[in-house]
Amino acid sequence: MAGLKILFVSQEITPYLPESEMALIGRNLPQGIQEKGREIRTFMPKFGCINERRNQLHEVIRLSGMNIIIDDTDHPLIIKVASIQAARMQIYFIDNEDYFQRKYILQDDKGTFFEDNDERAIFFARGVAE
């Protein structure tokens, strides 16, 4: 199992989103896997509430630039990366202006779910797979 490569995909990872059970799992599980000597890549959506400057996100040009078609519409895929220094772990962010620039994650400020959450989830999953 020495050459095992792991892809970890999570909707929430702390410190990028508020601490919750899922965000803590998204933060600690990949770190534990990495500490066991495994190669791991971690992905999450780049929601609009994530502060790019504070978290030092930057675009990975060589991975960005392709389009993902959803419902007969092209949507540019942007991939950004940041590091959790204490864990020596990189987190890759799937971004798209149409789907992830809102300041809320899955619901608006009134608690109403966004009507395109299904498309957003499809874009995220396909972006990770690409």
Model-predicted segments: where are they?
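Catalytic cores of nucleotide-sugar-dependent glycosyltransferases that transfer UDP/GDP/TDP-activated
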Residues: M1-E130
